[in-house]
């Protein structure tokens, strides 16, 4: 039996996520130096609304979107009922902040973040995560992104990152391409402090195995609130150092073309596999905000193959597959030998 959340749970999570949106937008405007976010507030007929912020054509970001929403309704979509049937028949509430950044320079990765909270009758949970999608990756950048999120998880519980890292690799996977969307990060969902940490569908996967190894969760509502808070605060220190290192790096039309080609994979994942996109469309969300994650430009090329030994080939052979980014000495050696460590 789940413990009831605090009486002010909805207001508390709403304020957390609004503050997260504000802090991220401020940090991104500062590092961009040129672009400014424009804001649109919107209301949903069935209840709730949000504020969508988009920065276009900055010095760093071709497009950056940071959205907040707070919505409620009476009829749950099937995607939720299939996961938590005990929520059926109850009015529901959901709030979240989501972000996708599409930089101009191919040496600066695309990045995504989402933290959310849901209630329906006796059911409540937290979900969220952040993941990085580089086009011309460097191992040091990958490590910094992972390390900041690992530290954030471990402030709450030493075992969480052991599950959230492989869960991210599992979730952001394009089954029809047999490749990861990027180098991962953290991902978690349906966290209510009861049972196993892993709540995904792949019972034989690495995340499920890690969850079984660490045992059952014993976190309460406040712990999980702190998890969302810590992980949200980890984003800027995980990403801004990459911008500072790569923003001045020169690139050619060839590298821009490859960036646009790989952005096509981002589009494919978000429209075919992403649960957040599906939930938003099923619940009559604001379409412009839901599809804010899509890049302003992308391209597809039939039968593309990267040249062996090229930076483009390194991406698809190494950096779109789950890795032990910190402890694999062969990977570290390879990256150093091929000038893709730092």
UniProtKB/Swiss-Prot annotation:
The lineage of its organism: Bacteria, Bacillati, Cyanobacteriota, Cyanophyceae, Synechococcales. The keyword Nucleotide-binding does not apply. The active site is at 112 (proton donor). Homodimer. It comes from Prochlorococcus marinus (strain AS9601). Keywords: Chlorophyll biosynthesis, Cytoplasm, Heme biosynthesis, Metal-binding, Oxidoreductase, Porphyrin biosynthesis. Pathway: Porphyrin-containing compound metabolism; protoporphyrin-IX biosynthesis; protoporphyrinogen-IX from coproporphyrinogen-III (O2 route): step 1/1. This is Oxygen-dependent coproporphyrinogen-III oxidase. HAMAP family: Coprogen_oxidas. It is an enzyme of class 1 (oxidoreductase). Pfam families: Coprogen_oxidas. The gene is hemF.
